[in-house]
Amino acid sequence: MSSNTGDQFANLGKALSTTASVLFSSQPMEDTILSYSSPYKKLLHETITNAGGGSSLVKVRHDVKLSKGKNTGFQDIYSNSKEFFKNSYSDPKTTFKVLSYLSDDLLEDAPRDTIPQNKNMITENGEKRSAKSKKQEPTLFQGFEASLPVINETIELQQKLIMNSDMKPLTDSESIPVYAEEEEQEEEFSLPDHLKADKLLHSYSASFLKDASRSITDNLDLLEIQKNLAASEIRELDIKLEKLKMMRELVFKRVAKIEQHELFLEKHLNNVKDRIDMIIEYNMDKEYSSEDEENINGLSELSPKTGETNETYETAATTPLENKEEEHSPLLSKSIYQQLQDHEKKSDISERKKHSTSKKIKDVGVSHRNRRRKTYPTLQQFYDSGSKITSLPKAHDEDITCLDFDMPFGTMCSAGSLDHSVKVWDLSKKKQIATLHGHLASISCMQIDQYSTLITGGRDAVLKLWDIDKAMADEASNSSEDNDACLYTFDSHVDEITAISFDGDNLVSGSQDRTVRQWDLNSGKCTQTIDISFATGPMRSQRNIPLRNSVLLTKEPPAIGALQCFDAALATGTKDGIVRLWDLRSGKVVRMLEGHTDAITSLQFDSVNLVTGAMDRSIRIWDLRTGILSDVFAYEQPITSLHFDLDKIVISNNEPTVKIYNRKDGNHWFCGEDDPEQGNVDFVRYKHGYLVEGRSNGDINTWAI
């Protein structure tokens, strides 16, 4: 054994004897062992760090094989934390104390708090501390002690919820959650350490009162810590909510982008279906080949844009091939356009011109059967109820007379009181995409379906059937023909058309000539005329109601203010305030609903209820099964329009706000700001939680309801 090892064992023996004397002495162990001049510390230091580097701890490190190229510390040579303190000459506890000991020299560099620590967070007298003193943070133990009551309360509440989870609610009050009942009950507080308020007020013992004061002060300290902990949780929740809000915005934009993609694919899917119908109808089907693809690619610059296929087809059908070289051109020899021309050569062109109008009308019915949408927009349901989605300021120069849209974020058509045309809008892109010209006077009513079919009626006593897709294609290609999108014109009425409704192949229109006409959309012919006979006279309630900024001041209410048809059922609302239910198969009235005291301006029905609005300011809800009035309510101004679904009824009455009535719970609320400078709402349309309203200043707004 070397001399270094012998000295090491000798020093270790001295250290062990010193340790035994410390353990059996009456002086505190920490003061003896960890003092700067401790003989125990000195002997152990000499034992472990013996001169010459012969200590066991140093040998262990040199004996371990370290991997090359890695920067490892002393702790990295052991697989777990316990092996870090193992050696051949001392137990792990002793080694831990030695290795974790910090001398006074090292502690001199540690930052010190010049302000003495005050255990009390507030003074006993409840006075605020001096502004110069720094705020003392609670210790870890104080925070743990303050959180214990909250933890216990949470555990008790959880136990109550578990105990009540198996109990079936027998009454409405028993079905209320336990935590809700706890919140409704008044909170009772008590003094700490079972102190009684009466005893404190009547006690003359100074020591008892001092102890009580300290106890209450300590309790206030704990409450202050609890409050700070709760405030910290609120701040953390606010941060999390902000992050969740940002994430929601990102996902919201993703949904909007996906729905835009769906609309794009739906549009091209409809074009493909129309193409298939045309090929099948004219028996032009053939096998697809690579040469067809080359010819189509070669014609891509010459072929019309999307939506112009029908126009190209009609032009090819009526234009003969005069150039022989063009007829044998390799570019067109095997293209589908050449087949179209060859097919039309064999057909009777004059006969096609004769029946071209009836074919357009027939295509509307075919379109309805084939164009079934696979997807529908749902983005509106992710907006807050009553929030504005978009705005189209000054969409028209004057007030909006009528508007309609096919689906949320889809296509909208609108008309103004001084316009003789219809404007077509893309609600998702918030811009005008087409204009429909053809009426000779202002347009008073319109309806659009989800298949891009629009029917309008105006003061020129005509109805027009429009193809919106064709209008958008013509607008995109800068077509010079204004009436290409008009498929048909119905012109049997002799006065202004005030109301229309179409369902499937049937179209019903009401006019100031006091007739209701039924049209066949397959042939364009009027199949039935119903005369509406009622006595005329001054409207009683209207004369006593002051209107503000209303177009109703300048004209009398229409003879037929509203109507709706479904299959063989027809409902009409007229100037005499009576709702008539008709059977279109017989052309006779089957029921009359009386109750309004003025002209009816709007109505709508579903399978159960009929809702009517009139100039007597009232909304009436009728039960169609019994003909009895189910509900009635009124507003301050006459009703101009209404629309509803299974959940809500939206109403306009020449006021700045849209009135909303919840059909399920009966609640009334307003949508928009009550600001007269923004104009009054004249017309509303509502579908699938998506509201579009037109105002007297020409603005159009969309809302999430």
Curated annotation (Swiss-Prot):
It is a peripheral membrane protein. Pfam families: WD40 (PF00400). Signal peptide: none annotated. Residues 125-136, 342-351 have a biased composition (Basic and acidic residues). Involved in mitochondrial fission. Acts as an adapter protein required to form mitochondrial fission complexes. Formation of these complexes is required to promote constriction and fission of the mitochondrial compartment at a late step in mitochondrial division. One of its GO terms (cellular component) is mitochondrial outer membrane. This is Mitochondrial division protein 1. CDD domains: Mdv1_N, WD40. The gene is MDV1. Belongs to the WD repeat MDV1/CAF4 family. It is found in: Mitochondrion outer membrane. The lineage of its organism: Eukaryota, Fungi, Dikarya, Ascomycota, Saccharomycotina. WD repeats lie at residues 395-435, 438-476, 492-529, 547-594, 595-632, 634-671, 676-705. The keyword Mitochondrion applies. InterPro entries: G-protein_beta_WD-40_rep, WD40/YVTN_repeat-like_dom_sf, WD40_repeat_CS, WD40_repeat_dom_sf, WD40_rpt. It comes from Kluyveromyces lactis (strain ATCC 8585 / CBS 2359 / DSM 70799 / NBRC 1267 / NRRL Y-1140 / WM37) (Yeast). Keywords: Coiled coil, Membrane, Mitochondrion, Mitochondrion outer membrane, Repeat, WD repeat. Residues 110-136, 290-310, 342-369 are annotated as: Disordered. Residues 216-250 form a coiled coil.
